[in-house]
């Protein structure tokens, strides 16, 4: 097992250091420039669209709303990356990793806008809802069905299996620390709950997510704000520590900046998923009048995940000063940091929070995989087999080592993201045109912009739902 963990780590170093970071930052800055800084200029519109329920499709009761699509994507984004991932990034990359998490969120949000807008543009009619995502725009937009199948397999493995094993691993570690519950028992409980909900389909997942997500996110944010207020005199010093470790001479000479950069981007990507090709799978299911609406909604999801929730965790850890001791890593470091601020109840609070955070991620991750199973095959047996396999991986994650679980997730994430970034760079011109169409309608006084496929006659035959 140690040899396998080391091998996976070596492959990850090559992918994440020499390929993925360059591609992520390159795409982020390119899309930011081409969209005229859409992620900064249209924040007000993003918030307004959360209440948008106007679709143009008959039988809308079978489709999900903009807010439900937002909730499912946040359910997947807001998971172990926000508590355990931030702790790991700070432990391995130092406080400077937090700065690079902010950078990848601020600029990478433009990639999230492009991929989700394209997913809406190329969505198709499913059985009870729209379906779409990178596999569909690779097939219909790029005319490369083989690429869509490759991406679908990568996503199924990454989200359905690898990421869900990480979520399960973190939940079990937190409950073992807080309540001394064995990972095997907790794994059985998680597996049973997962079976019950995922066999209810996208509507049940949407309902559960739209309830869990606001409660868990707001509860954690309020606790973090309380801790920040308690430590407000230390806040300038913590921010200075983050900036100094991101750019300081001492860190540059010691190679610390490179480690901070790599950890910040790696954990930031795992947390907010910008450019990864995951959120577009649920963005495509929303019933909206214009593809840009879901692009903006999913951009807001990136900001919510990293700039708000990940930052809360980072401040809690850095206020405690425990990151520099090396006594703990991952979720246990976050638990120890909260204990330092609010007493022994901190361990229990984090265990409960991670249960909601990570379990909602399991549900969101499951749906991403299901959408791609349906892309690969329409055989009726495929979905039940996939559902059982997901539950098997939830159980596997409960018993696996932390390093192996994270390593598998990282390598799968890297290959999948590279595949998606290539596609959205090639198809980005259509998202730019859609954004311009949306802006023109808004400037002309239209409060609710509407898109029809005759506005893009050159690709009209590929746009099934418009």
Residue ranges and their predicted role:
Residues 3-4, 34-39, 81-86, 95, ...:
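Transmembrane helix-loop junctions in multi-pass membrane proteins
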Residues 23-30, 35-47, 169-175, 181-231, ...:
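Membrane-interface loop-to-helix entry segments
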Residues 37-64, 88-98, 102, 110-142, ...:
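Flexible loop linkers connecting adjacent transmembrane helices
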Residues 27-32, 104-128, 134-169, 173-198, ...:
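Helix-loop-helix module between adjacent transmembrane segments
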Residues 57-90, 118-121, 127-135, 139, ...:
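Alpha-helical membrane segments and immediately flanking helix-loop junctions
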Residues 9-48, 91-128, 304-310, 411-421:
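Extracellular loop-to-transmembrane helix junctions
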Residues 1-80, 91-96, 425-466:
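N-terminal alpha-helical transmembrane segments of multi-pass membrane transport
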Residues 113-122, 127, 223-241, 255, ...:
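Extracellular/periplasmic helix-exit of transmembrane alpha-helices
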């Amino acid at each position: 097992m140690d040899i396998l963990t080391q091998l996976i780590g070596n492959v990850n170093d090559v992918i994440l250091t020499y390929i993925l970071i360059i591609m992520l930052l390159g795409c982020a800055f390119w899309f930011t420039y081409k969209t005229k800084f859409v992620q900064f200029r249209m924040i007000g519109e993003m918030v307004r669209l959360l209440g948008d329920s106007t679709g143009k499709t008959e039988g809308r009761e079978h489709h999900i709303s903009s807010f439900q699509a937002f909730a499912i994507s946040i359910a997947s984004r807001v998971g172990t990356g926000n508590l355990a991932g931030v702790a790991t990034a700070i432990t391995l990359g130092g406080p400077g990793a937090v700065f690079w998490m902010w950078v990848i969120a601020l600029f990478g949000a433009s990639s999230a806008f492009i991929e989700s807008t394209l997913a809406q543009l190329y969505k198709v009619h499913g059985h009870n809802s729209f379906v779409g995502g990178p596999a569909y725009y690779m097939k219909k937009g790029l005319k490369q069905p083989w690429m869509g199948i490759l991406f679908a397999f990568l996503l199924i493995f990454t989200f359905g299996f690898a990421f869900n094993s990480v979520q399960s691993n973190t939940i079990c570690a937190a409950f073992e620390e807080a309540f001394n519950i064995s990972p095997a028992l907790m794994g059985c409980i998680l597996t049973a709950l997962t079976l019950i909900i995922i066999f209810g389909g996208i509507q049940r997942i949407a309902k559960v997510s739209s309830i869990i997500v606001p409660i868990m996110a707001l509860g954690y944010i309020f606790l973090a704000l309380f801790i920040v207020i308690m430590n407000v005199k230390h806040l300038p010093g913590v921010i200075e520590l983050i900036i100094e470790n991101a750019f300081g001479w001492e860190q540059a000479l010691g190679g610390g900046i490179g480690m901070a950069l790599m950890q910040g981007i790696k954990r930031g990507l795992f947390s907010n998923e910008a450019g990864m090709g995951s959120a577009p799978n649920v963005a495509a299911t929303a019933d909206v009048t214009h593809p840009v609406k879901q692009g903006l909604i999913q951009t807001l999801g990136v900001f919510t995940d990293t700039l708000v929730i990940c930052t809360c965790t980072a401040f809690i850890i850095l206020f405690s000063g425990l990151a520099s001791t090396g006594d703990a890593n991952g979720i246990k470091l976050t638990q120890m940091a909260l204990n330092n601020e609010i007493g022994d109840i901190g361990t229990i609070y984090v265990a409960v929070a991670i249960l909601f955070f990570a379990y909602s991620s399991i549900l969101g991750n499951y749906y991403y995989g299901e959408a791609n199973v349906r892309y690969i095959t329409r055989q009726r047996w495929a979905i039940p087999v996939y559902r059982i396999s997901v539950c098997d991986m939830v159980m596997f994650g409960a018993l696996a080592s932390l390093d192996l679980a994270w390593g598998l997730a990282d390598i799968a994430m890297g290959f999948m993201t590279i595949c998606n970034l290539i596609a959205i760079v090639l198809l980005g011109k259509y998202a730019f045109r859609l954004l311009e169409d949306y802006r023109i309608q808004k400037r002309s006084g239209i409060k609710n912009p509407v898109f029809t496929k005759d506005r893009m006659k050159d690709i009209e035959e590929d746009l099934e739902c418009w």
